Regions:
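Aromatic/acidic polysaccharide-binding cleft in carbohydrate-active enzymes
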Residues: 314-401, 414-419
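Conserved, mostly hydrophobic/aromatic
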Residues: 60, 195, 267, 343, ...
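Substrate-binding cleft and catalytic face of glycoside hydrolase catalytic domains
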Residues: 65, 88-257, 272
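C-terminal beta-strand-rich structural cap/linker in extracellular carbohydrate-active enzymes
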Residues: 481-506
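N-terminal module-boundary/linker segments of secreted carbohydrate-active enzymes
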Residues: 31, 35-81
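Noncatalytic carbohydrate-binding groove/subsite architecture in carbohydrate-active enzymes
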Residues: 170, 209-339, 346
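Bacterial N-terminal signal peptides
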Residues: 12-24
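Carbohydrate-binding surface patches
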Residues: 418-461
């Protein structure tokens, strides 16, 4: 209960920045690979013909750090530019649910079928477009979308309507959702592919307190139908509940209704509570980082995977926070790299999100108090210290970069099996671009030579790569040659407790 209370307090505070039944399991463990090898060489088999999910990308909740409907910008222009370059050029996030403030702080009018645009925070959206969206798009972020979730925190005026007239309440929710998509199109010139519809609506934050899976489903249907009548193809990211199991239950209720299902673009989930096997960085390092992933956590993710397969809907991991380690440390980087590997492997997650894309020291002090260190935001991708004009890519940011810098939208995750449970390998093929990529995590205390055989393709030349270990981040590697005769195998030395990314053409 303490963890959930802390979650609600923290996320409610962060929500005010934006606006102006899981239990940790310590039971059985499961292994997904062989025991740690006693020799120095690790063998990895990759089957390029055995495809899993299509990758969508990497992202984060995106706070513009512009408040009061655009009047209060926390970041000096040069510092903002550096921060955005770190997020979108260097780490290479492409996705993000973007805060739009309260958006509709008071009901626009009494008719949910008539939109009074004067009541919307369009000025704030214009400022966000000028200072965040347009620069981010220029740097490659082509998957940003409205994050004005349906929440009684953001729209308290909905409460009496909900209590007195449920049908009108659904229409008001639909108007709220559709207005954001329409104005996003008008201001940015782009129709968003997605809309983040809910965030911990029933559990954790409980942003729709007193709601039910039926109400969630009704909102999806009403808002989706109104979007289509407005000519908008935007689909919804649903669930994003407190834990994988709770997210699966909520998503199952929505997807079982064919009228609602047609509007769903992805199933979102969170990995909480904070002590869970994949939220806590220490638990990650002690569990899957030692070759012992938690069996219940794996089962929950496989249930999400199976649900997505059943309805042909992608699965996204849409938030993680409270890792608990210094964001400057290699342990923090390696822990989140392990989590990404496992979310992709067990849930077939097509997207992985950090907590926030950017966060700054002024906002941190104003909303959490001066005693709270900016470094406590360890799962935000880039931290900005305004007093020293410094921009820090966190361990979580570097971990995401080890994947995002090498894996583009449309790539396929393919089957990879390591004969050492301390050496984890994710493999991807991208037929459109003729590239294959690999992320290798060595959790052992010693360096390893990793020999990778790829069946089903032949490389046209050597691979290139980068490596993180100790205090070094994304260090460029020399050319990694492939076998001359067949071009389907390569070997690379990976230091102890390191993360390595490699890519080559085929």
């Amino acid at each position: 209960m303490m963890a959930r209370s802390r979650q609600a307090v923290r996320n409610r505070a962060v929500w005010f920045v934006l606006a102006g039944a899981y239990s940790a399991t310590a039971g059985a463990q499961t292994r997904t690979a062989q025991a740690p090898s006693t020799g120095a060489e690790v063998r990895v088999q990759v089957n390029a013909a055995s495809a899993h999910q299509v990758m969508e990308g990497f992202g984060a909740t995106t706070v513009p750090l512009i408040y009061q409907n655009g009047a209060d910008d926390k970041l000096p222009p040069a510092l903002r530019t550096r921060a955005l370059e770190a997020v979108y050029r260097d780490v290479r996030l492409t996705l993000g649910n973007v805060s739009m403030g309260q958006w509709e702080p008071q009901n626009d009018d009494a008719d949910p079928m008539h939109l009074n645009e004067a009541a919307l925070e369009v000025a704030g959206l214009r400022a966000t477009n000028d200072k965040l969206l347009a620069p981010a798009r220029a740097l490659g972020a082509d998957g940003l979308y409205p994050g004005n979730v349906v929440s009684l925190w953001a729209t308290e005026w909905l409460k009496p309507i909900r209590a007195s007239d449920y049908n009108r309440y659904l229409d008001e929710c639909a108007e709220y959702v559709v207005s954001a998509v329409l104005k996003w199109r008008d201001v940015t010139g782009e129709i968003p592919r997605y809309q983040h519809l809910f965030n911990e609506a029933l559990y954790g934050n409980v942003e729709l307190r007193g709601s039910s899976p039926k109400e969630i489903t009704d909102i999806v249907k009403r808002a989706g139908a109104r979007l289509r009548s407005a000519g908008m193809p935007t689909t919804f990211i649903i669930a994003s509940e407190y834990s994988p199991a709770l997210s699966a239950a909520e998503a199952r209720a929505v997807l079982s209704d064919p009228d609602a299902r047609q509007y769903v673009g992805a199933i979102g989930y969170h990995p909480y509570p904070y002590e869970s096997p994949y939220a806590s960085m220490e638990n990650i390092l002690a569990g899957p980082g030692m070759g012992r992933p938690d069996a219940n956590a794996v089962a929950d993710r496989r249930a999400l995977r199976d649900l997505g397969r059943q309805y042909n809907v992608p699965v996204w991991m849409t938030e993680v926070s409270h890792g608990g380690l210094d964001p400057r440390s290699m342990d923090a980087l390696r822990a989140r790299a392990i989590e990404i590997h496992d979310e992709l492997a067990y849930a077939d997650a097509s997207a992985f999100f950090a907590m926030h894309a950017i966060w700054d020291s002024k906002s941190n002090t104003e909303h959490f108090g001066a005693a709270r260190s900016l470094l406590k935001e360890e799962d935000t991708v880039v931290l900005i210290e305004i007093g020293t004009s410094s921009v820090l890519i966190t361990g979580t940011g570097y971990a995401i970069g080890h994947y995002a810098r090498w894996v583009q939208r449309g790539a396929l995750r393919v089957e990879s099996v390591s004969d050492d449970s301390l050496v984890m390998v994710s493999a991807f093929t991208d037929k459109k671009r003729g590239k294959a990529s690999f992320v290798i995590i060595n959790n052992a205390d010693t360096a390893k030579t990793v020999r990778v055989h790829v069946s089903g393709l032949a490389f046209t030349g050597p691979l290139e790569g980068e490596q993180s270990e100790g205090d070094v981040r994304w260090k460029a590697l020399g050319a990694v040659p492939t076998t001359e005769a067949t071009g389907d195998e390569f070997a690379v030395t990976v230091p102890a407790k390191s993360v390595t990314s490699l890519g080559g053409t085929f």
